[in-house]
Amino acid sequence: WIMGHMVNAIAQIDEFVNLGANSIETDVSFDSSANPEYTYHGIPCDCGRTCTKWEHFNEFLKGLRKATTPGDSKYHEKLVLVVFDLKTGSLYDNQASDAGKKLAKSLLQNYWNNGNNGGRAYIVLSIPNLAHYKLITGFKEALTSEGHPELMDKVGYDFSGNDDIGDVANAYKKAGVTGHAWQSDGITNCSLRGLDRVRKAVANRDSSNGYINKVYYWTVDKRQSTRDALDAGVDGIMTNYPDVIADVLNESAYKAKFRIASYDDNPWETFKN
């Protein structure tokens, strides 16, 4: 999965997919009542990027729905996965469940079209704080009470705080999650970070009793760091330059071993090295 980083304006969906992304990451900010409000990152952000592009969350979802609904004039067949980077840092811990419920209702209405031929992309809910695990249970409760528990098949999870892998496993246990687990590791492109924790995550994925299904690394903009991440065995790379990742995947060393994921590749299934 080539994951376009910080895609917060509808116009950027086309831009990143046309550069080679089959997945995008979108920031979601919340208001003080735990409603998802804007697709917005804010300052500071990655070096070389504009930090302030934004849409109202529900409007972004409608644009995203068009981009992922077969037959729509804006449809991109290769856009198959969306990571919502949930900026829950503005919320109190006890608002996490509410945030999950409100997020689910927004998605149901504006992305899944109330279960009637909505967008088809798989969705990853990426949560920065292990203490906010109830966002997952709230999300699930809302979809169930709205009569669409089947949509949970399209939803996966990520805790993005670079926490100890054992602590992440524990948070999933509390949330009642088994499966659909993506594990991110990384740092802003302005800094360097080693691959030690990525290797631990890959080892967990490849073990018989690990909780991780997929591992992705962020934010990778250079050819050499792309090669290093691929050599470590990641499933996804988040980037500001999807064309760089696509170029490296075309190199003879990687062409035989990796390919770009399509809609038929189940993002919740573990593919072991």
UniProtKB/Swiss-Prot annotation:
<feature type="binding site">
    <location>
        <position position="85"/>
    </location>
    <ligand>
        <name>Mg(2+)</name>
    </ligand>
</feature>
<keyword id="KW-0442">Lipid degradation</keyword>
<dbReference type="GO" id="GO:0016829">
    <property type="term" value="F:lyase activity"/>
</dbReference>
<dbReference type="GO" id="GO:0016042">
    <property type="term" value="P:lipid catabolic process"/>
</dbReference>
<feature type="binding site">
    <location>
        <position position="27"/>
    </location>
    <ligand>
        <name>Mg(2+)</name>
    </ligand>
</feature>
<feature type="binding site">
    <location>
        <position position="25"/>
    </location>
    <ligand>
        <name>Mg(2+)</name>
    </ligand>
</feature>
<keyword id="KW-0800">Toxin</keyword>
<feature type="glycosylation site" description="N-linked (GlcNAc...) asparagine">
    <location>
        <position position="189"/>
    </location>
</feature>
<feature type="disulfide bond">
    <location>
        <begin position="47"/>
        <end position="190"/>
    </location>
</feature>
<keyword id="KW-0325">Glycoprotein</keyword>
<keyword id="KW-0479">Metal-binding</keyword>
<keyword id="KW-0456">Lyase</keyword>
<keyword id="KW-1015">Disulfide bond</keyword>
<feature type="disulfide bond">
    <location>
        <begin position="45"/>
        <end position="51"/>
    </location>
</feature>
<dbReference type="GO" id="GO:0031640">
    <property type="term" value="P:killing of cells of another organism"/>
</dbReference>
<keyword id="KW-0443">Lipid metabolism</keyword>
<comment type="function">
    <text>Dermonecrotic toxins cleave the phosphodiester linkage between the phosphate and headgroup of certain phospholipids (sphingolipid and lysolipid substrates), forming an alcohol (often choline) and a cyclic phosphate. This toxin acts on sphingomyelin (SM). It may also act on ceramide phosphoethanolamine (CPE), lysophosphatidylcholine (LPC) and lysophosphatidylethanolamine (LPE), but not on lysophosphatidylserine (LPS), and lysophosphatidylglycerol (LPG). It acts by transphosphatidylation, releasing exclusively cyclic phosphate products as second products.</text>
</comment>
<keyword id="KW-0204">Cytolysis</keyword>
<protein>
    <recommendedName>
        <fullName>Dermonecrotic toxin LapSicTox-alphaIB1bi</fullName>
        <ecNumber>4.6.1.-</ecNumber>
    </recommendedName>
</protein>
<dbReference type="GO" id="GO:0005576">
    <property type="term" value="C:extracellular region"/>
</dbReference>
<feature type="glycosylation site" description="N-linked (GlcNAc...) asparagine">
    <location>
        <position position="250"/>
    </location>
</feature>
<keyword id="KW-1061">Dermonecrotic toxin</keyword>
<keyword id="KW-0460">Magnesium</keyword>
<dbReference type="GO" id="GO:0046872">
    <property type="term" value="F:metal ion binding"/>
</dbReference>
<comment type="similarity">
    <text>Belongs to the arthropod phospholipase D family. Class II subfamily.</text>
</comment>
<keyword id="KW-0964">Secreted</keyword>
<feature type="active site">
    <location>
        <position position="5"/>
    </location>
</feature>
<dbReference type="InterPro" id="IPR017946">
    <property type="entry name" value="PLC-like_Pdiesterase_TIM-brl"/>
</dbReference>
<dbReference type="GO" id="GO:0008081">
    <property type="term" value="F:phosphoric diester hydrolase activity"/>
</dbReference>
<feature type="active site" description="Nucleophile">
    <location>
        <position position="41"/>
    </location>
</feature>
<keyword id="KW-0354">Hemolysis</keyword>
<dbReference type="GO" id="GO:0090729">
    <property type="term" value="F:toxin activity"/>
</dbReference>
<dbReference type="Pfam" id="PF13653">
    <property type="entry name" value="GDPD_2"/>
</dbReference>
